[in-house]
A protein has these predicted regions:
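Short, conserved micro-motifs composed of acidic
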Residues: 1-176
Length: 176
């Protein structure tokens, strides 16, 4: 439990027997609020399990077999929206995090160097492998203008037409 955290997220079976994600908030040294089911965009008809809150408290990762996905349990993220004061619609993390098998237990290391998760994609359903994805901090070699970036996003097709794949700006130092 993170030091100073006031809200925790956990999975528990609901009245139908499906697992859903709940939150509870610390009211004082020994009292917690009644558990609250998360909003309907996160709560699915299937099982929503293994919630993990990012260190900055703005991203909630979890595994679900009830949202549209690649098959089995997939990994999802929902971002906190200050605008609506709630979690937004979950997004499937896609490959390499999600697969047609069961993928769960998402975790980012505190130093941001690794993402760790478990999956049975290359094992039987009764065992899992733990995967660690390492991120390298690559130095930014050059910044380019929006005009230069727009030209990079153009793809020349065999019929001499161009396909514009689009450009997104980033104001972050890591270009994410």
């Amino acid at each position: 439990f993170p030091k100073g955290a006031k809200t925790i997220y956990f999975s528990a079976p609901d009245k139908s027997g499906s697992w859903s994600i709940y939150s509870t908030t610390k009211l004082n040294e020994s009292l917690w609020s009644a558990p609250q089911l998360l909003n309907e965009s996160i709560t699915s008809m299937g099982n929503d399990i293994f919630p993990y809150l990012s260190a900055d408290g703005k991203s909630l990762y979890f595994s679900s077999n009830g949202h549209f996905g690649m098959g089995g349990y997939d990994l999802y993220v929902s971002r906190w929206s200050d605008e609506i004061g709630d979690w937004d619609t979950p997004q499937n993390l896609g490959f390499p995090f999600s697969s047609p098998a069961d993928d769960f237990l998402y975790y980012d290391t505190p130093d941001g160097k690794y993402t760790i998760f478990a999956s049975n994609r290359s094992t039987g359903r009764d065992s899992v492998n733990v995967y660690a994805i390492e991120y390298e901090n690559l130095a930014l070699k050059k910044t380019i203008s929006q005009e230069e970036a727009a030209n990079i996003a153009l793809l020349n097709l065999p019929d001499n037409n161009q396909y514009d794949d689009g450009v997104e700006e980033s104001d972050k130092a890591d270009n994410s």
